[in-house]
Design a protein with these regions (language model features):
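Short pre-active-site segment immediately N-terminal to the catalytic Zn-binding motif
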Residues: 60-76
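Short active-site segment of divalent metal-dependent hydrolases/proteases
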Residues: 77-85
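Hydrophobic or amphipathic, alpha-helical segments that drive membrane association/targeting
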Residues: 1-9, 13, 33-45
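Hydrophobic beta-strand residues in large extracellular and virion-surface proteins
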Residues: 3, 18, 35-37, 59-63
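Catalytic zinc-binding patch centered on the HExxH motif and its immediate surroundings
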Residues: 36-60, 69
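Short helix/loop segments within enzyme catalytic domains
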Residues: 121-123
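Zn2+-dependent metallopeptidase catalytic core
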Residues: 9-32
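Post-HEXXH active-site segment of zinc metalloproteases
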Residues: 70, 74, 86-115, 119
């Protein structure tokens, strides 16, 4: 797996955090995958902490820096769980299907991928 970071002032800490999280999730040695992590000043007019988009080959994670650093790391953990979900094919790239079941009409808090990400983000 190739991991690229952009716009983080605490690169060494973020790299260690990501490496440990990927190893914990047992996806640190995936071949032919790219993980791009970008830090921006804010998302969605300051309301969103982060988001992930991707598929089985590449995931892009964006983290907002207008929150405390520890919250940024928690958000990064949450989005890394989504990365694992994309890489494994559990989560569709259009964020509507989980394990081939359509959840396009489900509320945010009822989406299985969000339930899983919230469950494990603090581990």
């Amino acid at each position: 797996m190739r991991v690229r970071f952009k716009n983080t002032k605490k690169l060494h800490l973020v790299q260690m955090f990501v490496n440990n999280a990927l190893e914990y999730m047992n996806i640190h040695d995936l071949e032919h995958t790219d993980l791009n992590i970008r830090f921006v000043r804010q998302l969605d007019n300051g309301y969103s902490h982060g988001h992930a988009t991707g598929d089985i080959g590449e995931v892009d994670i964006t983290i907002a820096t207008n929150f405390p650093f520890l919250m940024q790391l928690r958000t990064l953990a949450h989005e890394l769980i989504h990365a694992r979900q994309f890489f494994s094919g559990q989560l569709s790239s259009d964020l509507t299907a989980w394990k081939d079941v359509d959840y396009s009409k489900a509320d945010y808090e009822d989406q299985p991928w969000e339930i899983e990400a919230h469950k494990y983000e603090d581990q």
